[in-house]
Amino acid sequence: MKRVVSIVLLLLLLPALPAAAPGTGAGGGLTVSAPSAVLMEKETGTVLFEKNARDTGFPASVTKIMTMLLIVEAIESGAVSPDDVVTASERAASFGGSCVYLEAGEQMSVHEMLKCIAVVSANDCAVAMAEHLCGSEEVFVRRMNERAKELGL
């Protein structure tokens, strides 16, 4: 399962690589097309490059990566099984944007929900899993923030 998550994460992050890799611009500086970026040296924490580093951005689907991590960790700990059935709530079914159009009461396995989150970036499945794992979206968000702190993010 860890290998699957690693592959999914790699596939999700691959589109960002061309934007960061073109090389140098005129004058020898790094050229980055992203609206903001920070490059730091791992050992010392020295900032090697920054562009709009203090700007606030929105996490978008990056939160789905944390959602998938918590799902996989719940599977590995035995808290849930990939075959467990998840029932979509009215709230989960009401989410738009990237979704698989779950209907309230619709049931899918944890494994299927995880695939929908990874492949489609399904908001409805992410909310259904949050509710399944933690009882509510709010408690799940707190758990994501705790886990992010544990990881030093």
Spans of features found by a protein language model:
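N-terminal Sec-pathway targeting helices
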Residues: 1-6
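Bacterial N-terminal signal peptides
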Residues: 7-16
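Active-site-adjacent loops and short helices of periplasmic peptidoglycan-processing enzymes
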Residues: 19-153
